[in-house]
Structures are given as structure tokens and as C-alpha cells.
Swiss-Prot record:
Highest taxon above the source species: Eukaryota
Presence of keyword Cytoplasm: yes
InterPro entries assigned to the protein according to its UniProt record, in alphabetical order: eIF3f (IPR027531), EIF3F/CSN6-like_C (IPR024969), JAMM/MPN+_dom (IPR000555), MPN (IPR037518)
Name of the protein described by the UniProt record: Eukaryotic translation initiation factor 3 subunit F
Subunit structure: Component of the eukaryotic translation initiation factor 3 (eIF-3) complex.
MPN domain sequence ranges: 7-155
Main localization category: cytoplasm
Organism lineage: Eukaryota, Metazoa, Ecdysozoa, Nematoda, Chromadorea
A Pfam short name: JAB
Cellular location(s): Cytoplasm
Keywords (A to Z) from UniProt: Cytoplasm, Initiation factor, Protein biosynthesis
Gene knockout outcome: Extended lifespan in adults.
Organism of origin: Caenorhabditis elegans
Keyword Protein biosynthesis annotated: yes
């Protein structure tokens, strides 16, 4: 069923939408009704889910009951993004609003035509509508309300055709690639800063932080296994047990402890040497730049 689809939205999509909203709000502070932002969602389809990995805003206007969309700009952006990322295709559109309005029907009809023409499928693919309430007018005061919908046509039994359309809500989840997770963890560190800034750590500091996190998680897993096997304080979970077995299987390489210790030391020594050479090169470039500009 189409209503069982899950919409996985990546962090960059939310950042692009919020950035577009802030820019449009500043540029149209004197124009009433111009604070909304609309754009195209890029991504790909998977079994039971839609991955939304990128997006871009398009110029549009809905003042004075006139709905205008810059189709040429939209088509050019879709073509450019498909050249840079061939795996991505238009999968829907977004609108910064608290609820579905009557204008959404016209916008959706436009995107049905655009996405159907750009799709290689014979049938029209599922086209998702993502609404983002940037005014926080919903019940969630600390989280920005985000909803996804899929339009379906409805009609009276025995009628010649459908007479209305229904936007069915879909499940929305936050998904991220490994690189995006690293960036999000770095951004979260700025939440405790007054200036809302996060500094990049050096190579050795990042290695130290990652090692400390790994040790912390290993201690948590060890305590969990001890509580289940020896103390009996926690009931066993088959799913967690399988995940722990997968971790042990993936980490075991049938290597003797002496060889493993030598491999770790050599790898760390190589990493330190590369980091030292990078710092030395950076210092030489800075000195050369000062000598040239002097």
C-alpha cells in the first residue's frame, strides 16, 4: 500500500529549507504572504521508502489569488542536479506551511506532470508532499513540525471518475549517511556554546575522541551482557544478541594478539607521521605567504 511508505529525510534537506525560509523572510519583509517557500525534493525510491537526500527552492508567487511557478528555473535545476548526481531524481516537493491548503492541489498537479515526465517508469511514481512549519505553530514547541503526504483520488461508487483528492499522511524519519552523521555530531557540540560555534578538532584529537567513544560503547555492551548472563537483572533480547554477534563476527579477523598489536602500532605510527608532515607543510605555506606579501 502506498500509505505504508516511509519518507526518510536527510539533514541537508532541512537545512536548505530553513535557510531558504530565512532568506525569503528577510527579502520579503514588506510583502504580505510572501514568507512561504516552495521547492523540489530530490532523492530516490527504495522498497517501502522514499529517500529525500537533496532539495532546492524555486521562485513562486501566490499573492492576489494568482499562482505562479517558475517552471524554466525548476527544469534547469533538475537537469543540472541529475548531471551531478545521476542516482537522484525528483521525488516530490516541499512547502513551508502548517497545513495543506487548496493551493497545494494546483502545485501537486504541476509536480505530477514534471516528475512523470522526468521518471523512467511507465506508471507515475509516488510523489510526496513535505510540509515544514517554520513558525512552530503546532503542539510541538521544541521540534519543528514536519509532515509528509501522498495524494490519492477518491470518488463515489458508481461515478464515472474521482471527484476529490485526499492527502494521506506518511511516516517521516530522519536518515543520514555516515558523513552526515559526523557533521551533525559536530554541529550538536555548538548547542552548549554561547556563540553557537563549533571548532574542528585536529587529527589526533579526533582519533582520541573516537577511541574514547568506542571504549564507552564497549563498556556499555559488556555491562549489558553481564547483567543478562550473571546477574539476571535484565531479560535477554534476541535482536540485541544478534546485533552483538554481528559486531563480534565483523571485528574478529582470526589474527594473533601479537600481530594485531603490531598492526595497530604501525598504523598509529603512520597516522602520526602523516599528521606531522601535514602540519609541517601548512607551516611552510604560511611562512612562504608572509614572505611573499612582506
Amino acid at each position: 500500500m502506498a500509505s505504508n511508505l516511509t519518507v526518510n529525510v536527510h539533514p541537508g534537506v532541512y537545512m536548505n529549507v530553513v535557510d531558504t525560509h530565512m532568506r525569503r523572510t528577510k527579502s520579503s519583509a514588506k510583502n504580505t504572504g510572501q514568507e512561504k517557500c516552495m521547492g523540489t525534493l530530490m532523492g530516490y525510491y527504495e522498497k517501502g521508502s522514499i529517500q529525500v537526500t537533496n532539495c532546492f527552492a524555486i521562485p513562486f508567487n501566490e499573492s492576489n489569488d494568482d499562482l505562479e511557478i517558475d517552471d524554466q528555473f525548476n527544469q534547469q535545476m533538475i537537469s543540472a542536479l541529475k548531471k551531478t548526481s545521476p542516482n537522484e531524481q525528483p521525488v516530490g516537493w516541499f512547502l513551508t506551511t502548517s497545513d495543506i491548503t487548496s493551493s497545494c492541489l494546483i502545485y501537486h498537479d504541476y509536480y505530477v506532470r514534471v516528475i512523470t515526465e522526468a521518471s523512467a517508469r511507465r506508471e507515475s511514481p509516488p510523489i510526496v508532499v513535505l510540509t515544514i512549519d517554520t513558525t512552530f505553530s503546532g503542539d510541538m514547541s521544541k521540534r519543528m513540525p514536519v509532515r509528509a503526504y501522498l495524494r490519492s483520488k477518491a470518488g463515489i461508487p458508481g461515478a464515472a471518475g474521482p471527484h476529490c483528492a485526499i492527502f494521506n499522511p506518511l511516516r517521516v524519519e530522519l536518515a543520514a549517511f555516515p558523513g552526515e552523521l559526523v557533521a551533525m555530531q559536530l554541529i550538536e557540540k555548538a548547542l552548549d556554546s554561547r556563540r553557537r560555534e563549533a571548532t574542528l578538532e585536529s587529527g589526533l584529537e579526533q582519533l582520541e575522541t573516537s577511541t574514547a567513544q568506542m571504549i564507552e560503547w564497549l563498556e556499555r555492551m559488556l555491562h549489558y551482557v553481564e547483567d543478562v548472563n550473571k546477574n539476571g537483572e535484565k531479560p535477554g533480547d534476541a535482536q540485541i544478541g544478534r546485533q552483538l554477534m554481528d559486531i563480534v563476527t565483523a571485528s574478529s579477523n582470526n589474527m594473533q594478539p601479537e600481530k594485531l598489536d603490531t598492526l595497530v602500532k604501525n598504523t598509529l605510527r603512520d597516522y602520526v607521521m602523516v599528521s606531522y608532515l601535514a602540519k609541517l607543510t601548512q607551516t611552510q605555506l604560511q611562512v612562504h605567504e608572509r614572505l611573499v606579501s612582506a
